[in-house]
């Protein structure tokens, strides 16, 4: 799907947006996190519900997630891979969070993330978010302790 010419520019623009979402997550700023999310963005997250739709739902989900932490937390994006054309792009990565929840539980978790983008009115916007963790087929439980 890569095209000649603006591919490098598109990839660098997407990379900057992903880095900005990581910074916004570390700052626990839901509005900054969703600044480049399309109004009708659809999300598949690692927690319930099965899906959510709309940037307002993303803001609400982010605020819930941020409020579940005891202070700040570490948030990193690893192995970011971007594929982009002039009007659509997607990226995937392994993301890592480390911190303490408000209930005192220590969290050191990795998950898989995919973001899909469309260029809307000359601006890259996130149109789909997918986060997942593998699960153990024998127990049916999420594999939250797995590391790359």
Q: What is the role of each PLM region?
A:
Residues 21, 25-29:
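Short helix-adjacent coil turns
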Residues 110-140:
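Short beta-strand edge/turn micro-motifs at domain boundaries
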Residues 1-12, 146-148:
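Basic/polar N-terminal segments that are highly enriched at the extreme N-terminus
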Residues 98-107:
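Short, cysteine-centered beta-strand-loop-beta hairpins and adjacent loop/turn segments enriched
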Residues 8-12, 16-17, 30-85, 94:
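A solvent-exposed, acidic/Ser-Thr-rich amphipathic alpha-helical stretch
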Residues 21, 77-82, 95-97, 112-118, ...:
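Hydrophobic/aromatic beta-strand elements that line small-molecule binding cavities or substrate pockets
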């Amino acid at each position: 799907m890569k095209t000649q010419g603006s591919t490098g520019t598109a990839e660098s623009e997407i990379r900057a947006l992903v880095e900005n979402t990581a910074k916004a997550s570390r700052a626990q700023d839901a509005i900054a996190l969703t600044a480049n999310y399309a109004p009708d963005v659809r999300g598949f997250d690692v927690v319930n519900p099965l899906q959510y739709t709309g940037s307002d739902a993303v803001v609400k989900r982010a605020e819930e997630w941020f409020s579940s932490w005891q202070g700040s937390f570490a948030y990193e994006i690893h192995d970011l891979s971007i594929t982009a054309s002039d009007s659509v792009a997607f990226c995937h990565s392994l993301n890592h969070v480390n911190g303490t929840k408000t209930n005192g539980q220590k969290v050191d978790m990795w998950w898989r993330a995919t973001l899909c983008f469309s260029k809307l009115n000359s601006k890259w916007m996130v149109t789909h978010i997918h986060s997942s963790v593998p699960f153990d087929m024998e127990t049916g439980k999420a594999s939250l302790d797995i590391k790359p």
